[in-house]
Amino acid sequence: MFNYEELFQTYKTPFYLYDFDKIKQAFLNYKEAFKGRKSLICYALKANSNLSILSLLANLGSGADCVSIGEIQRALKAGIKPYKIVFSGVGKSAFEIEQALKLNILFLNVESFMELKTIETIAQSLGIKARISIRINPNIDAKTHPYISTGLKENKFGVEEKEALEMFLWAKKSAFLEPVSVHFHIGSQLLDLDPITEASQKVAKIAKSLIALGIDLRFFDVGGGIGVSYENEETIKLYDYAQGILNSLQGLDLTIICEPGRSIVAESGELITQVLYEKKAQNKRFVIVDAGMNDFLRPSLYHAKHAIRVITPCGGREISPCDVVGPVCESSDTFLKDANLPELEPGDKLAIEKVGAYGSSMASQYNSRPKLLELALEDHKIRVIRKREALEDLWRLEIEGLEGV
């Protein structure tokens, strides 16, 4: 059992705490699921891009799914090889494209004809041939939160099959483009196997037709991964997920690329916070803690529910419903409504669970609140993997603007 009290003697709340053994096992589970087939697991940095987490995954052989030049540079800094990096995203700038091509990453996932032509122009100016993949929008409902559904025709992502074919043929004729992969990503937090299997089958058929047209595909890039059980939902078994993809690729000699993020890191993380006050208003009980929505946005943005565990021993205290809220000046700064928790006192410690994904990576300095300390638990030892920002860090990049005023 982990001794939190020793931790609290050294580190002040709030802070993130990650169990690196859980991250390692989650990644190895993906490798095992695709064992026996040429595959590359490209961790999606958007879930959590802490350098120490990336370094851990790099040492396990991970690639990287990146959506900005900043993420690409983070991946490289952590030791992920350029030939294991794919660059996705609907709005890559010309600067980002040029930098990615100069770094000789594995390929760029292209999301529009205009982007394809931009890549061609930049590749020509560099005198190189750009490896590209085209993201196909299969128009399949992922049955997930609408904010993270990405595979329907009304979503901004990817292109329809007809346009994809035109883009592949254009790229095939170009002296500066090399089409090497097909790509699709229907959404995040998938809890139903059928949509991902259907999408895989549909895009696999497209891949076969492209190969028949003489396009030398080498990769089959499946965006995303399986969902996480935040509220005791039934989740997809990783073996079934992998088999659904593998079965769709019968007759195709392509390397599978899988891009999990949430399912690698979510369950590893806790946000440790302490009670500041309790109050009642209109018979409503509020527990006010020192972490805020700027530190962990998912409950406010997606109405996501994360279990909250009381760390401080509270035996014998009366249990009743309460809203656990933060100090930010927004009514949406609420971590959990109607949580059944014991009567709490200032200084009592709580853990908000399964926050390893889309926690620190979505954090901000809203209300001029410094970003949090991040700790890793590895081999029964604690180490700092991100220092807490100082107050001075809030305005460090603005000081020059005061000169001469």
From Swiss-Prot:
Gene3D superfamilies, alphabetized: Alanine racemase, Lyase, Ornithine Decarboxylase, Chain A, domain 1
Record keywords, A-Z: Amino-acid biosynthesis, Decarboxylase, Lyase, Lysine biosynthesis, Pyridoxal phosphate
Reactions this protein catalyses: meso-2,6-diaminopimelate + H(+) = L-lysine + CO2
Source organism (scientific name): Helicobacter pylori (strain J99 / ATCC 700824) (Campylobacter pylori J99)
Pathway: Amino-acid biosynthesis; L-lysine biosynthesis via DAP pathway; L-lysine from DL-2,6-diaminopimelate: step 1/1
NCBIfam families: lysA (TIGR01048)
Gene: lysA
Description of how the protein assembles with itself and partners: Homodimer.
Binding site for substrate: 262, 298, 302, 330, 358
GO molecular-function term, one example from the UniProt record: pyridoxal phosphate binding
Cofactor(s) named in the record: pyridoxal 5'-phosphate
Function: Specifically catalyzes the decarboxylation of meso-diaminopimelate (meso-DAP) to L-lysine.
Listed name of the protein: Diaminopimelate decarboxylase
